[in-house]
Amino acid sequence: MNPKALCSFLLATFLLLTVTIMPSVHANAEANADAIIGPCPKKPIGIVC
């Protein structure tokens, strides 16, 4: 593998991981905030706050 291809591969992998991991991290942070502060009132019905 030449360095340019390797760099592209690593960048693509990083972006994929970011897109995959960030929403779950965000959901966990929101759940933790709800546990500390209390449920947020402005969520649509059907979404567990």
Curated annotation (Swiss-Prot):
Keyword Disulfide bond: yes
Signal peptide span: 1-27
Tissue: Expressed by the venom gland.
Keywords: Disulfide bond, Secreted, Signal
Cellular localisation: Secreted
UniProt modification remark: Contains 1 disulfide bond.
GO cellular component: extracellular region
Residue numbers covered by the propeptide annotation in the UniProt entry: 28-35
Origin superkingdom: Eukaryota
Recorded family membership: Belongs to the formicidae venom precursor-01 superfamily.
Listed name of the protein: U6-myrmicitoxin-Mri1a
Record organism: Manica rubida (European giant red ant)
